[in-house]
Every structure is written in structure tokens, then in C-alpha cells.
Amino acid sequence: MQTLIFEDALCAQLSPLAAARPACSLSIGSVTLLERLLPFGQLLTSLRPHLRRYLEQLAGTRAPLWGGPAFAADGISIPAAAARPAETQSRYGSLLLVVNARVVPSRESLLTLRSIVEAGHRGIVRTPSAVAAALLHCSPTHDGPDDRLLQMLLAGTAAADTTELLKAHDLVELDAMVDMLEWPHELVSFHELALAGSLAVRLDSGTYAELRPGLFVAPEAHVADEVVVRQGPVVVEAGAEIGPFVCLDGPLWIGPHTKVNPHAWLRAGSAIGAQCRVGGEIEASVMEPFSNKAHDGFLGHSHVGSWVNIAAGTITSNLKVSYGPIRLPARPGHPAGRVETGRQFLGALIGDLAKTGIHTSIPCGATIGVAATVSGNVPAWVEAFTTTLSDDGGLPSRTTGVQAATGLERMMARRGVELLPADRDLLQLLAENA
């Protein structure tokens, strides 16, 4: 069996969170869609051109900037140890599961996709505006209509092509439904709904020891005796270190090799990715791998990309003074204008490689672009590759791809990760198109 994850035109609308990474590599409820689909067998991707080029250059030499599974030179993900491709291949043979990269990787989505595969009926799952998934039957001789469709999907150069190719193919509509992302703030909403189920899936593996009621710890993790667990589940992955006098409220996930500094308060609904450094107060937020929020400050109802540094004293507002619903700022050149989130609590949406200065204040619903640098009182919208020092009264300045790569190289060195030419080329391309 094979699985193809494809990006459609609306993936770009998830920027800044999905500007420098595939939408299927965004974390929701402690897991990405790509990780959810690894057990389904050999995994292929059809991504936006700049990401396709990046992964081709990377050619499996290292995991991509955003962490997670590595990719081989042909764009096929290298399966994790938890995957069972041989078993899946023998059971489902020539089936091809096609999944939109914007599908929410919840436990419910996983069960729906599994049921589609188990039933084995060739068909398509639609939403009013998109194709969510499809199941195709490939031929043993690789010359059937679904085989030809697969080759066209893999060769596609425009995101819209994939959706149109699937819609035009002769497929029966399947009676199934999965949640899909449309706007970046929905990552916060779906994360809140998915985290408990995601942790339940992890705990079902039986690899965690319950050190005390509600605290589940993987081997080689260290939790100081003085840590307080007020409610569970709190799941701590291998190699993580939690210092003394930390307060933990579940549901909470702490990723592999992440360090939690003494006196931190990690509140319910948070998921801290691999190799992060965290301190202060964090509530109902996602931090993608390799990011820092090591000092006092508050991060609430936010989504933070990879290789982000949140400096000491940085505070995100997550509730309006009026207690009213929060709106996302209007995107330059986008016809939608301001986006009604319907959320009373919403912090910041921070793209990969962004940085804040000390004592930075970030308003509700702020959107901070890839490789942006902010300090002082931050505006609601910050373009990618800009430096916005609002307290000096000046206009934002541009950050070049070379400058962003230099800063990233220094940050990577502290994690023992090498910056590769493919990383530099990706940043240069993103900077040129910012």
C-alpha cells in the first residue's frame, strides 16, 4: 500500500505557519499528519514547488528544518521505527490512499482514514471547497488509470492541479468526513480538541511508566522530585529533562530531549516539541521542535514554529480587554480582509525562525512571519523577513536570506545541527518572495 499527501491551493493560506514547511508537518495534538500516516505504508508527497525543491536538495541527508521524519531523494518519507510498511503492504497491496495535507491529524481522522482503507472501496471524500481524501486502486502492472493519475499527481507543478485532477477522475463519493484546516488560527482550535485523544494514542503503546498519578514518563527522561502534577495526563518523552519546582497541568505533552527550566508553569492544553527549551508560563500552546522560550514571560493559546527564539519577558496577550471575539489582521493583498476567528482566547501565530527581543508585547491574534524579528509593542501583522523595532519609531527593515541563514546557523550550532546548502537555498527563496 502507498499513501500520497498532497498540498492544495489553500495550504498557502495557512501562512506564516505553513510558509516554510508542508502543511502536513504542522503539529496538532502532539503529532503531525505526516507522522499519523507513516503506519499506512510507503509515503509519497506532492508539495508546493519551493518545498519540493528543498526536499529534493536535502535528499535524506538530514531531517528537514521543521524536524520530524527525514525524506529520501525521491520525496518518499523514510519510515519511522513505529511504522509497519511490510504488514500494511501485504494486507492492502495495490491500494493508494490520497490525503490532503490540510486534514487535521486527530484520532478521529485517523480512524476515518483507516476505515476507508479497510473497506477498500475506490472513491473520493469531498468538502464543499476541497478534496479531503481519495482511495485509488493501482494495477500490479502499473498501467491502469489510477496509476496514470498517480504519476500526474506526483509530477504536478501547481497545487490547484492536484485538486482538479482528483475531481475530474471517475471516483464515487465516499460517505466519510474529516476535519480540515483553512485558516492558521484553526491550528489552535483543533489542537485543543485533539490533544487528549493524541495522548491517549501514545499511552496505548504501553511504553510509558506512570511515576505518579497522571504523570507518564518514557525511558531516559528525567523529572525532578520537586515537580508538581496538578492534573493529568502529562506525557514526557525520552530524553526530556524537567527541573525542580515546575508545575504541570494536563493534558500536556513534552517532546523528546526538551528541557523545562525550574519554576516553569506548563498549563493544560500545551504541546512542547522535540529539543525545545522552555520556562515561564505556557498555556494551551504548541511549540514546534527546536524552539526556545527559556525565560519568564507568558505564551498563551499560540502556535510557535521551529527555530524560534522568544526572549525573556516576552508576553502574548490572549484575551481582549472587552472579552470579545478576536479577529486576525487583514493580510496584504488578500481579499478576505480581517478574519473572524470566533475565539475569545487567541495569542500569537509565529512562523518558523522568528525572534522576539526582551520585554516584547504581542497583541491578541498577532501574525508574525517567517524569519521576522520583533521587539517592543508588536503590530498585529508582521511581514516575513522584516525587523520591526516598534519603539524606535522607524519603519521595518528587511532581513535578507543570507542574514536569516547566518542567524539560523548560530542557533543550530547550539543544538548540534549543521546548516546545509539546501537550508540556505530555501531561506533565500523565501526571502526573495516575502
Put a short name on every predicted segment.
Residues I5-A9, A159-T163, R230, L248-D249, ...:
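Short, flexible segments with low predicted structural confidence
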Residues L10-Q13, S25-S27, P262-H263, R277-A434:
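Glycine-rich hexapeptide-repeat left-handed beta-helix
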Residues A18-R21, V227, T341:
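Short coil/turn segments at secondary-structure junctions
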